[in-house]
């Protein structure tokens, strides 16, 4: 396909046009008084949302060159989303401000490479300052504040996420589901839950709710198929003498063995339930080993030289309670704390070593199941459109609170970056010179952009607000919801340091790339050929 090649100023201006379009579409959502954006969908109802990265992903322009500019800024948003899960709009606004200021300098004859060096050095300095400013959070109140701000000032959501974190711990998993009611609810599962239910409904002890509840059961864990009932007889006899229930978790149970278990259960000889092991292949084995650690038992596997027919009672795990329905199994166990901690450390090491996002996700799930538990937030709303918007806000809020726990919090509402401008100026004047200093000045001039946009979206004059904030103490900022200047930390208007840091780093990275662009090679727009004229028909006197 033929290409169009554009050089120098013309190339950078074309990129700038695309960047302007995307930045403006995303920036309208910033702050407590930010508006929504409607996305038209090819199929189904339009989506009304307030989430920067989702809007950025939807924007495609007709002009290929301008579209390249859109793609660059979109990258700043999605990288921030990947790293911190929130702050995508801030990253877009920052990147846009840096590109605008930088292009003016390049047009005036500044060396783009030196400017980029200055931008990178300024960015590194600011990252270290954000780390210094960050206050670690421990209490549930600060977590709730973080969630509230990220969810667009929804206090109920903030409190719900704080409760969930309280219950499942920092390592715990908080997942989102679309609820069936109008209200958003929180459901917390203690212990380990996995997505496999009983093999036969005859194992249910509560026929009304179709649940099997086993109190203080023994747990037999094996990674092989149980084909013959003879394999199970020795261990079943030992358990029958104790009078305790038994849960069998195996790769599969063949019909004959299953029938024997069901008959014993129905006759009241032995309270037993059987479940298929979760996962596949190596992952299944790893999850079974996790369960063995959690229940203080052993995984009966031929790799370790253990066979079912010579399994002893002390090889079996124990739990306080096991609840099984047709889809899930929940084990509430009080395992050996030291062993569980050791296993968690092992999983964390594996997470550090793997490059695959999918593997990381699965390891995080395993870690959560071992360490804390699982909290499920069931999102409720009146319409599907509202549900989707709410779900995206909740996702941001969950990510923001996790980021806050990791790296601490800083004053929110664009305040931190605005105050850091004067620190950057002092540092740059004594450490940089020439065009590198100009590069640092570009970053310094852009730092107030998020605050200015928040103020403008609230109907105030952005430049005036930014100047007022700069003249106040470092934790003071502008509360766009009320129009007052207040102590942001005391008022609970906070941002996770990780979100602020990621947004700044990604914006600086993209700005540097755009400024050092000297040539663009893009596809030529395809000419639509006129449709050929229709044929003369079939001929003859036929009526078609």
Swiss-Prot record:
InterPro entries, per the entry: Chaperonin_Cpn60_CS, Cpn60/GroEL, Cpn60/GroEL/TCP-1, GroEL-like_apical_dom_sf, GROEL-like_equatorial_sf, TCP-1-like_intermed_sf
Name this protein carries in UniProt: Chaperonin GroEL 2
GO biological process entries: protein refolding
The organism's place on the tree of life at top rank: Bacteria
Record GO terms (molecular function): ATP binding; ATP-dependent protein folding chaperone; isomerase activity; unfolded protein binding
Organism: Prochlorococcus marinus (strain MIT 9313)
Gene it is expressed from: groEL2
GO cellular component, as recorded: cytoplasm
Top-level EC class: isomerase
Statement: the UniProt record of this protein carries the keyword Magnesium: no
């Amino acid at each position: 396909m033929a290409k169009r090649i554009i050089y120098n100023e013309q190339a950078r201006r074309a990129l700038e046009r695309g960047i302007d379009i995307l930045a403006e579409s995303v920036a309208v959502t910033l702050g407590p008084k930010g508006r929504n954006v409607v996305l038209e969908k090819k199929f189904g109802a339009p989506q009304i949302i307030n989430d920067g990265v989702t809007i950025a992903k939807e924007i495609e322009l007709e002009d290929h060159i301008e579209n390249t500019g859109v793609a660059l800024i979109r990258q700043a948003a999605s990288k921030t989303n990947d790293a911190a899960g929130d702050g995508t709009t801030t990253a877009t606004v920052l990147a846009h401000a840096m590109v605008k200021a930088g292009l003016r300098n390049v047009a005036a004859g500044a060396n783009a490479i030196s400017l980029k060096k200055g931008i990178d050095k300024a960015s590194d300095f600011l990252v270290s300052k954000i780390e210094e400013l960050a206050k670690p959070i421990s209490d549930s109140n600060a977590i709730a504040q973080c969630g509230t701000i990220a969810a667009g000032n929804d206090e109920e959501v903030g409190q719900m996420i704080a409760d969930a974190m309280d219950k499942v711990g920092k390592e715990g998993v908080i997942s989102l589901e679309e609820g069936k009611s109008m209200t958003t609810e929180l459901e917390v599962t203690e212990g380990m839950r996995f997505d496999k239910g009983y093999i036969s409904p005859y194992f249910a002890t509560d026929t009304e709710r179709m649940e099997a509840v086993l109190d203080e059961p023994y747990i037999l864990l094996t990674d092989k198929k149980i084909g013959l009932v003879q394999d199970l007889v020795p261990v079943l006899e030992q358990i029958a003498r104790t009078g305790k229930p038994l849960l069998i978790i195996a790769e599969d149970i063949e019909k004959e063995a299953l029938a024997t278990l069901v008959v014993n259960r129905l006759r009241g000889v032995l309270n037993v339930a059987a479940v298929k092991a979760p996962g596949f292949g190596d992952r299944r084995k790893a999850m079974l080993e996790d369960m063995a650690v959690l229940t203080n038992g052993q995984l009966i596997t031929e790799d370790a030289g253990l066979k079912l027919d010579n399994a002893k009672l002390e090889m079996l795990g124990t739990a306080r309670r096991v609840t099984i329905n047709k889809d899930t199994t929940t084990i509430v166990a009080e395992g050996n704390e030291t062993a569980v901690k050791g296993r968690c450390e092992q999983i964390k090491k594996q997470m550090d070593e793997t490059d695959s996002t999918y593997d990381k996700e699965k390891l995080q799930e395993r870690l959560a199941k071992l360490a804390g538990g699982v909290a499920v937030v069931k999102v409720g709303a009146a319409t599907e459109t509202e549900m989707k918007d709410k779900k995206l806000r909740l996702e941001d809020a969950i990510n923001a609170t996790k980021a806050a726990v990791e790296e601490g919090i800083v004053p929110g509402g664009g305040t931190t970056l605005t105050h850091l401008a004067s620190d950057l100026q002092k540092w740059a004047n004594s450490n940089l010179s020439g065009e590198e200093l100009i590069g640092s000045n570009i970053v310094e001039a852009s730092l107030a952009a998020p605050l200015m946009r928040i103020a403008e979206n609230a109907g105030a004059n952005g430049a005036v607000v930014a100047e007022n904030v700069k003249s106040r103490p470092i934790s003071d900022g502008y509360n766009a919801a009320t129009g007052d200047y207040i102590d942001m930390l005391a008022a609970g208007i906070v941002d996770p340091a990780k979100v602020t840091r990621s947004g700044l780093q990604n914006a600086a990275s993209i700005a540097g790339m755009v400024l050092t662009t000297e040539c663009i090679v893009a596809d030529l727009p395809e000419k639509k050929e006129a449709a050929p004229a229709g044929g003369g028909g079939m001929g003859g006197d036929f009526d078609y």
